[in-house]
Curated annotation (Swiss-Prot):
It holds the Pfam family NAD_kinase_C. Its main location: cytoplasm. Its cofactor is a divalent metal cation. This is NAD kinase 2. The active site is at residue 52. HAMAP family: NAD_kinase (MF_00361). Keywords: ATP-binding, Cytoplasm, Kinase, NAD, NADP, Nucleotide-binding, Transferase. It is found in: Cytoplasm. Involved in the regulation of the intracellular balance of NAD and NADP, and is a key enzyme in the biosynthesis of NADP. Catalyzes specifically the phosphorylation on 2'-hydroxyl of the adenosine moiety of NAD to yield NADP. PANTHER family: NAD KINASE, NAD KINASE 2. One of its GO terms (molecular function) is metal ion binding. Belongs to the NAD kinase family. One of its GO terms (biological process) is NADP biosynthetic process.
Length: 267
């Protein structure tokens, strides 16, 4: 890790219990070669303290900054996919930094554009579902090709790192984050003599654009999930999803690869 990066911003929930647990970490940083700042825009390292959900919030609320390093520190008994460090093991963090046992990993993110105007980024996934108990009808385009007309509860579009989350729970594939791609998975699709979809997840190259065109009856009540946040916009006609040119840079232990984490969590 570049030691010229020494301005830290700590992102965490300001409750009394967590403040007490974070205090020794801040004190250690201030005694070392780091400067702790109160504004993330002044930092070049953003440290998220909590769990994977907190890490997603940290990245989103600081604007998916491509020139910052993000570090995940867990407060739970087990480390997550984005948290390589544990708050109760400060010595391990210090030892790893001193002995160059860290490396920077660049994770792909997807860009979601709604009706050609508002754009949002996702590190895990974007999901499109109905706010009411009603089947959605969505025309699915890959680039300019009309691929299928989907009818069902919704669609999940996930990044490689997000493939272990919501996507996996609907039997999507786990994808290596070194692959520049994104995955499309169905939520309870209708398949019959009348309606037909592919009926399985599919993976698109990072050079592709996925376009979802809502039917008139579907456009009134969609809810868009952006990682762990929900966006409710009425009268959506079109959603374009592509792999962004941006990446999120994270600091991880060299001996804790993505597949190490998959094995630890699922096997």
């Amino acid at each position: 890790m570049d030691m010229e990066r020494n301005r830290l911003y700590f992102f965490y929930k300001r409750d009394d219990k967590l403040i007490e647990r974070v205090k020794p970490l801040i004190e250690l940083a201030e005694r070392g070669p780091f400067v702790v700042v109160d504004d993330y825009r002044e930092a070049n390292i953003i440290v998220s303290i909590g769990d994977d959900g907190a890490f997603l919030q940290a990245v989103r609320q600081t604007g998916f900054l491509p020139d910052r390093l993000y570090v995940g520190v867990s407060v739970l008994p087990a480390r997550g996919f984005y948290c390589d460090f544990h708050i109760d093991d400060i010595d391990h963090m210090v030892e790893a930094a001193k002995n160059w046992k860290l490396e920077v990993r660049r994770y792909p993110i997807i860009e979601v554009t709604i009706d050609g105007a508002a754009s949002f980024f996702c590190l895990n996934e974007c999901s499109i579902r109905s706010q009411i108990i009603k089947t959605m009808a969505i025309d699915v385009f890959i680039d300019d090709l009309h691929f299928e007309t989907f009818r069902g509860d919704g669609i999940i579009v996930s990044t490689p790192t997000g493939s272990t989350g919501y996507n996996k729970s609907v039997h999507g594939a786990v994808v290596d984050p070194l692959l520049p791609c994104f995955q499309v998975s169905e939520l309870a699709s209708l398949n019959s003599n009348r309606y037909r979809t592919l009926g399985s997840p599919f993976i698109l190259s990072g050079s592709r654009t996925l376009t979802l065109k809502m039917s008139e009856e579907t456009s009134h009540f969609p809810i868009i999930g952006l990682d762990n946040e929900a966006l409710s916009i009425q009268h959506i006609e079109r959603i374009d999803i592509r792999l962004s040119d941006r990446v999120v840079k994270t600091v991880r232990l060299k001996d804790n690869s993505f597949w190490d984490k998959v094995k630890r969590v699922f096997l």
